[in-house]
Amino acid sequence: MKEKDSKNKELLKNTFIIFIGKFCTQFISFLLVPLYTKYLITSDYGYVDLILTYISLILPIVILRSDSSIFRYLIDERDDKKERAKTVTSLFVLIIIQIFALLLLSTITNMIFKIQYIVSIILSTIMYAFSSMALQYIRGIGDNIGYSIASIISGITTLIVNIVLIVSLKVGGVSILISTIIANIFCVLYIAFRTKVYREIRRDSFSEKKLKKMLKYSIPMIPDRTFLVDDKCI
């Protein structure tokens, strides 16, 4: 009975910690809306907002929903350093390959259509990919406090950079993209230094077999995420 109560308390504690991090991020996003509507041209803000929606749409394809996979597998591998290294290294290699593919396709697309803010769009997508993986990694190893702190750092950085670029420097709509890039960089760096995850990325830890196994789990989940945002694109 005591063991059950202890597990319930731990579950409530972890749920609350994660809620704090997510709530902070959502609250800051809510605070930014009046800032955007007051200082940005409607067409500029609308364009960037649509771009962010497209990024949300293609991100699951870029990372093949491997953020869900890393969370799922690390839960069972928290105490197995060898398997953890295989999981992290294999997915890191996958992300690097996918990023090169993204760069190639983006370059070709931009040559044809001349997309505004293309560099910021590419960097935003890349950093969203890394931050998504990093956040699910830190959750997977059970560091929920670190997860919440990283989310809060990302949210506060987004707020500060937006205020500086939009209000003080009058940079315009691209400020939103720049702020997400910087915020995600800070988020990834914090998680990297807190968890020392880079120590788990080793050449001899790459496992093609493990990667295929994880992709079998994650790829079927791609449509689920894309359907959440495709109505906004339409």
Where are the regions a protein language model picked out?
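C-terminal transmembrane helix end/exit motif
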Residues: 70, 135-140, 144, 166, ...
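Hydrophobic alpha-helical transmembrane segments
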Residues: 119, 149-197
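Signature of the first transmembrane helix
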Residues: 10-64, 154-159, 219-234
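Interhelical loop/hinge segments that connect adjacent transmembrane helices in multipass membrane
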Residues: 1-11, 119, 145, 173-177, ...
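Membrane-interface junctions at transmembrane-helix termini in multi-pass inner-membrane proteins
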Residues: 73-76, 128-151
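Membrane-water interface segments that mark the loop-to-transmembrane alpha-helix transition
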Residues: 13-25, 51, 56-110
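Residue-level recognition of transmembrane alpha-helices
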Residues: 18, 22, 49-52, 91, ...
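Membrane-interface helix-capping segments at transmembrane helix termini in multi-pass transporters
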Residues: 40-51, 76-89, 99-126, 168-177
